[in-house]
Amino acid sequence: MTKNSSTVFTHARIATLEEKAANLGLIEEAALVVKDARIVYAGPENKLPDEYASFEKIDCGNRLITPGLIDCHTHLVHAGNRAHEFELRLQGATYEEVARAGGGIVSSVRNLRAASEDDLVRETLPRLDALIAEGVTTVEVKSGYGLDRDSEIKSLKAARRLGEERDVAIRTTFLGAHALPPEMNGDKAAYIDRVINDMLPAIAEQGLADAVDGFCEGIAFLPDEIARVFDAAKAHDIPVKLHADQLSNLHGAALAASYGALSADHLEYTDADGAAAMASAGTVAVLLPGAYYFIRETQKPPVEAFRAAGTKMALATDNNPGTSPLTSLLLTMNMGATLFRMTVEECIAGVTREAARALGILDQTGTLEIGKDADLAIWDIERPAELVYRIGFNPLWKRVFKGQIKPHVRMEPFMTIILKPGSVPLETLEKIYREGLPVRIDPAFHAGIEKAAARIAEIAAGDAPVYGINTGFGKLASIRIAAGDVATLQRNLILSHCCGVGEPLSENIVRLIMALKLVSLGRGASGVQLEVITLIEAMLEKGVIPMIPEKGSVGASGDLAPLAHMTAAMIGEGEAFYRGERLSGAKALGKAGLKPVVLAAKEGLALINGTQTSTALALAGLFRAHRAARTALITGALSTDAAMGSDAPFHEEIHQLRGHKGQIDAGRALRTLLEGSAIRRSHLEGDQRVQDPYCXRCQPQVDGACLDILRQAARTLEIEANAVTDNPLVLSDGRAVSGGNFHAEPVAFAADQIALAVCEIGAISQRRIALLVDPSLSFGLPAFLARKPGLNSGLMIAEVTSAALMSENKQMAHPASVDSTPTSANQEDHVSMACHGARRLLQMTANLNAIIGIEALTGALGVELRKPLTTSAELAKVIAALRAKVATLEEDRYMADDLKAAAELVADGTLSGVISAGILPDLEA
């Protein structure tokens, strides 16, 4: 998105889970407002403050909004499985017998030590995805299957990477005191020494643990041994939690309480005194029904004692390979109710509010209160109890993480954006493009749509000839069509105009085309029936995506061929994709439970006569170009620091004196990105270079100018996206008048502007790459940034690749709008060429992403070669994000994967996403 999300979720029921509220804090007929990833309002919709009236509105259809679910106790990162132990237990072996036979935790230790960090991440992601699919937004992940320093660190790093791979918050817990590794030969004291003197200091130094845990049980560690670990954790200022009283009562609950632990978990054998101690200390009881069920325990945790004492209770999956291979918090809630006799309210609070409390993050999440993170789960249920009582049923409609609606494994898109034709902002259009959300026209516009349709019906029934209603098309406009043939005329129009060639446009482009067509028709000047509108809306909601070939439009009279293919699917002809399968239009509609529409007078013409394909392609290019432009400022700052360049050219007054807004914004961004760099401070004095080359010194002037024309193109395209562009139009006085709004010249010019900006951003980025690999220009860096030049070629050919991509973009940047050719027997004798002018932007921005990705690799490596000097805090975050995907270059290696990964980090917004808010310039100035 171009800016932080500002969204109002309307027509909802909200379970706030506020602590003192009864009945889950349920509010009927409610609204929830998100701004900058935080909740700013949660209450009755009829009391919604006026200040939020301009925010984007999403109609939740009376669905239930709860806090995002939180799994507060998992061992999600593990290698392999222990299915053989499951078979042993079925034969009667106890937990202790399995452990003493070399199984249990020690078995998982062997597997984890043999796995790489990448292996662990790869194996864990499907388990995490299963949780996410049920509305989970926060997951705690414990180590404890490495049991040596390197393996425990590897496990925790893999856990942290999960939060980079998926849109979910990860809390990591160091569980070194989980079991005694076999190499210790039974010497628990020596192993605890290693935990507190070797593992914990290294983990604390790297900031890898949000908490420290231990397993207090006879088969693991006794209370005095756990106390040593907790004392060490306290010295490192890390909170603690404890596996306690699962198989016997060693008074682990009381021990946890005495240290003010965040939680004590399992607790089957906890007594009333332990429950009271936990309540007094504020230690949460985390109950794990999956383990209780899986190993067929007979002693239940004392839920009644916890209630009586006022101990807070949470629920968690305890996902682990041996005793609870469970990846469903919904099933966990059901188990909590049926096995432990918890109430519905206790179960739901146990995976939201109390789970957040158990992780020490209740001030951030877990309830729907003002100021907290906008982590939400939206459910298609009538009663909250349905979350608890059903088994194997997932009613999740949408998951919202940090204010952004995130896709999940279900294919149906359930959230709907409500569009107000004529005033749909760029932010909403980008959300439709990037997130694939379905849309609907605001019902307030239906009356105008129906009024225009009624007027067209009157004209069709009359005697006067009106273009496209009772005449032929284009050069055949003089031919009168009989009233009985009007429907056939519209159908023939669609079929005859399906002349597209080439590969299908991508789903996100087609969705945007359909949304733009809704906006245009929704203005009430096109004369289509409401049935046409509702079919497009239903196709977007159900996922019926017409197959539109990429080529065939000259950008006037509208995008005829592409939009004819869109309309063909609507009438049961042509082809469409449904859930990824390419089908006939009729079959795709049928599988989605939809029926083809029979087009009435003018409807076929209204659907195909418009600029929506060109505009959608240009908008996609704009959104991609803007993200790349923001990232180019980051990589430009990296390159400047790597080359020990000066930040003096970025001084604010220089840019204020010239006055261009883009230049001012670009200069400010570069200046802020470099702020605090030790590399820069190291050459403030005594640097004999007077000026840097233009590619570093003139970044604000070049990238700022590019930003300005992107913003100009954005204004043009926002207007066009809200325009009525078919022909003829039903005017406010009821007349149907022919005009030329279908001519896409404004879109063609905007596409050319974007192409020029993309070309120039890549050109100056490529010159910075060339500077860094040239030892005569890079101020002390080795040739091609190779650590052993000659033996290694370093980034030599990566720079060549960037040059090739730059040159290709120069060729494609030639203006498309200066071309024209007459068509339709010279009736349509000047055309815009907007469609292919916009379509080329997809390839150009892909090339630009690759160039900037190469600059990221080059700049990051150059900065690393300046060690022990360090770059700024902002740029260090960028390097860390890059290194999470691409290791630093020590020796020559296969480079194509590195370049691909770096380009993806540019394209998906990862690199720009780590920069603090407010530094990088927005598209809407």
UniProtKB/Swiss-Prot annotation:
Record's GO cellular component terms: cytoplasm
Positions bearing 2,3-didehydroalanine (Ser): 557
Lyase found in the keyword field: yes
PROSITE patterns registered for this protein in UniProt: PAL_HISTIDASE
Main location: cytoplasm
Covalent link location (5-imidazolinone (Ala-Gly)): 556-558
Catalytic activity: 4-imidazolone-5-propanoate + H2O = N-formimidoyl-L-glutamate; L-histidine = trans-urocanate + NH4(+)
One MF term in the entry's GO annotations: imidazolonepropionase activity
Pathway linked to the protein: Amino-acid degradation; L-histidine degradation into L-glutamate; N-formimidoyl-L-glutamate from L-histidine: step 1/3; Amino-acid degradation; L-histidine degradation into L-glutamate; N-formimidoyl-L-glutamate from L-histidine: step 3/3
Documented EC number(s): 3.5.2.7, 4.3.1.3
Superkingdom classification of source: Bacteria
Region (Histidine ammonia-lyase) residue spans: 415-925
Keyword check for Phosphoprotein: no
Modification after translation, per record: Contains an active site 4-methylidene-imidazol-5-one (MIO), which is formed autocatalytically by cyclization and dehydration of residues Ala-Ser-Gly.
Subcellular location: Cytoplasm
Binding site for Fe(3+): 73, 75, 243, 318
The record's free-text note on cofactor binding: Binds 1 zinc or iron ion per subunit.
Cofactor(s) this protein cannot do without: Zn(2+); Fe(3+)
Residues that bind Zn(2+): 73, 75, 243, 318
UniProt region (Imidazolonepropionase), positions on chain: 1-414
Record Pfam families: Amidohydro_1, Lyase_aromatic
PANTHER family: IMIDAZOLONEPROPIONASE, IMIDAZOLONEPROPIONASE-RELATED
Function: Catalyzes the hydrolytic cleavage of the carbon-nitrogen bond in imidazolone-5-propanoate to yield N-formimidoyl-L-glutamate. It is the third step in the universal histidine degradation pathway.
Protein's UniProt name: Bifunctional imidazolonepropionase/histidine ammonia-lyase
Source organism: Brucella melitensis biotype 1 (strain ATCC 23456 / CCUG 17765 / NCTC 10094 / 16M)
